[in-house]
Amino acid sequence: YKKDDLLFEFASEEKATLFGISAKYIDALNNRKVVPKNNHDLSKLRTICSTGSPLSEDGFRYVYNNIKKDVHLASISGGTDIVSCFVLGNLFQPVNVGEIQNRGLGMDVDVFDEKGLSIKNIKGELVCKKPFPSMPVKFWNDDGNKKYKSAYFEKYNNVWNHGDFAKITDNEGFIIF
């Protein structure tokens, strides 16, 4: 199992249409000059989801140049704590290099400045302004919800602060830093 593109071998053999990989794996393949499209039949592959960390602009370009030109690339951002995505891909919108396309279903996601004001095209805090379907309601053994409130609601009153820096673009896409 020392092959850099082993996961693409599995995707090819299984005729995968949806393939999830990490941004770090994409970066590693790029750095090692691996070209999966040359060695694997990825004709069935329609969507690649990238997660784990922000996908760089170079990572976007690598996917389209070396994996598959006509794939839908969906970088996503969320967390295990919410069992969901705050922002993710959307098959009905164009993919813009370096951007995550859309807010997740049921997610009132925004970017705030230090004062708690909504900002655009400026790096700020990724927040969710309203409760969402998979929002945890407490931490185990957290008397009075002190740790829970401190983790997510201390900075902005009654607004979930996820602890990630982000920017909303002119395309209404998101860049996660």
Predicted regions and their residues:
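Conserved AMP-binding/adenylation subdomain of ANL enzymes
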Residues: 1-17, 32
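Gly/Ser/Thr-rich phosphate-binding loop
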Residues: 16-21, 30-95
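Alpha-helix/helix-capping structural signal
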Residues: 24-27, 134
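Short beta-strand-to-turn element immediately C-terminal to the catalytic PLP-Schiff-base lysine
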Residues: 86-90, 112-113, 141
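Short, P/G- and charge-enriched loop/turn segments at secondary-structure junctions
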Residues: 93-99, 150-154
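Short coil-to-beta-strand transition motifs
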Residues: 100-106, 160
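Hydrophobic beta-strand positions
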Residues: 110-111, 167
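Conserved ATP-binding/catalytic segment of the ANL
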Residues: 118-119, 127-177
